[in-house]
């Protein structure tokens, strides 16, 4: 069996969808426009340049606004094509829900892209940001989430300022407040209703859709809303139908089922005299984190064009069957817009690697269990073709358990325990070389042994801050070295962050057509491990990241790549300092410095050392929260 390269098993050709690739030297390159082959930059060279020019300290989050612009263009183009092929006469509006990533640079990049799109807010604070960024051009704004009177007034102000603002009714109690505040401002509100469907997508976010969803109105509540609006002579205000199946839908059949059910709501509302003009299918457009085109939780079994065609066709068929007008289709595809635009580059600060050690045979007077382990070890080379490979490992496991028991009651010394543990590793390593991946029965134990002997890479980042979904919901993200991808697989590794938490590990890695518990790696010097890239982290991760162990935001570089491959860092942020993080938890850095000074003054340190300590402590407060080289 030929040895595969890192490039072949990390699936970059699939999850990268043209934005990320590998050049002839084996370095990962970024291509903001997949059709412009010369518009590329090496991630390794970019990192080195930012370190040199901006004195950047790793980890650094690289963001590519051109990818955001291209994603807008691609999604708009897919729906334009689908509408043309279906003869669909209604419009289309791609809406960006800012909860996916509320950072100013993201919203401003989208607003300046020249691509048509709207904005969505799910809270009062988000609406304040949306109204500001909408600017002087008429912008379609969807207002979701639970609302108080202030939220409602802000939305109505947006309508008065010339925007097309839809207040989506999430619960019946909101409608009275909306009508009252609209009357005070002398404005006719644009209303939407979120229908709670029976249909539900599968996956990690399935609870956000379906009958048990946190949001939306049931069928009977929708009828009550219609009755209330009729009584108030405001039925014409209800113009938008909204539903949400769940985020990151992996199966295109779930999309088709949800669109079909919601189209029935559209038909029935028209029968009740409600002139629905906008059909908001919500989120759900998934991205393929795994790169294997399946319907798993972290993949999708459809393309962008298939998604658009499924949505447009489902709505158009209902309109055709019942002779209804084609509404404007709205999608809230935040993950599809932002996921690819950001990649975190981090350095490895330490490597723990298994190294076989030559051991001497136990002394004649050593306990019997040690001799039993030694017999297993010597038996491997003498009879490897005559016995089950598993039996050697099982014998070693039984003996090692006995060693631990005897050690705990004082029958074995620490040196004897250490000898036994090392010999057991030698046994497993030697037997592991004899297993064959082609044998289905061997695969489970091969995986177990790979995890046991994988290099442990201690990476200078916080999983909780930079990849919170990997910790919280077991989300898989593409991760691989950013150099050496044309080299054969020579090692396996597991990644551990620098927090003081045993949950700070990455447990799942892309491995060709499947998912493994270890990451394929090229051979590399233990003292010079490659930099690692964590890809597709542009959706939710920056916003959900938490301050575990007071690790803060990483440095961020916004990069624009020219057609000749030259790049410009248009914005650079150094990330949080230690003082920043302490202030978040109400620790005043000035007060801390005062207390340091008091302790030093009461010490017997020489004056020169006391002054040096104070300077170092002050520099520490102003330093990066992540580990720094001297």
From Swiss-Prot:
Enzyme kind, highest EC tier: lyase
CDD domains, alphabetized: PLPDE_III_ADC
Coiled-coil segments on the chain, per record: none
Signal sequence residues: none
Cofactor(s) needed: Mg(2+); pyridoxal 5'-phosphate
Function summary: Catalyzes the biosynthesis of agmatine from arginine.
Protein name: Biosynthetic arginine decarboxylase
Gene: speA
